[in-house]
From Swiss-Prot:
Encoding gene, per UniProt annotation: ahbB
Record bears the keyword DNA-binding: no
Signal peptide extent: none
Family: Belongs to the Ahb/Nir family.
Organism from which the protein derives: Oleidesulfovibrio alaskensis (strain ATCC BAA-1058 / DSM 17464 / G20)
Protein name, per record: Siroheme decarboxylase beta subunit
Catalytic activity from the UniProt record: siroheme + 2 H(+) = 12,18-didecarboxysiroheme + 2 CO2
Length: 158
């Protein structure tokens, strides 16, 4: 069921979905900017976390600046009977940031599971591919190397 938000809650969410204020009291600053109090800000965020609308609250690392300069999307051929288990195994790897299942609709593209793997060097992400291949017995995959980042932003909802 879709949530409804008050104008104040939408204003709070507009701020927190971007960058928190660089301050010792970011939630008090948000409260001041939105005409409410710090407890209201914290209560909204706690409620949304408990409901599962907010998955986590934390810093976003720019992986290239942190030294993770090599990444690739790896597309795997996985049947739908094993996709949940294989997806769970892939998600356990610390260098895999995204795992998606998408049904194949193109006759010449049979891949259904997509993983985004990051490494400090090419061999690092190739090792993850090899490990996952051995753990899952998957043999058919395509490595789509990232050549250039054209856009990377977090989704803005409000």
């Amino acid at each position: 069921m879709a949530q409804t938000f008050t104008d104040t809650e939408r204003a709070i969410l507009r701020i927190v979905q971007k960058n928190l204020p660089d301050s010792a009291t970011p939630y008090a600053d948000i409260a001041e900017q939105t005409g409410t109090d710090e407890q209201t800000v914290l209560a909204l965020l706690r409620r949304m976390k408990e409901e599962g609308s907010i998955r986590r609250f934390g810093a976003s690392l720019k992986h290239q600046k942190a030294g993770y300069t090599h990444n690739a999307m790896v597309a795997w051929i996985v049947d739908k009977d094993t996709v949940d288990e294989v997806g769970r195994q892939a998600a356990e790897h610390r260098l895999i940031s995204h795992v998606y299942y998408r049904p194949s609709t193109a006759p010449d593209w049979p891949y259904t599971l997509y993983t985004m793997i990051h490494g400090r060097h090419e061999n690092e992400y190739l090792e993850v591919i090899d490990t996952l291949r051995k753990e899952t017995a998957l043999e058919e995959y395509a490595v789509l190397n990232s050549l250039k980042e054209l856009k990377k932003t977090s989704m803005t909802y409000f």
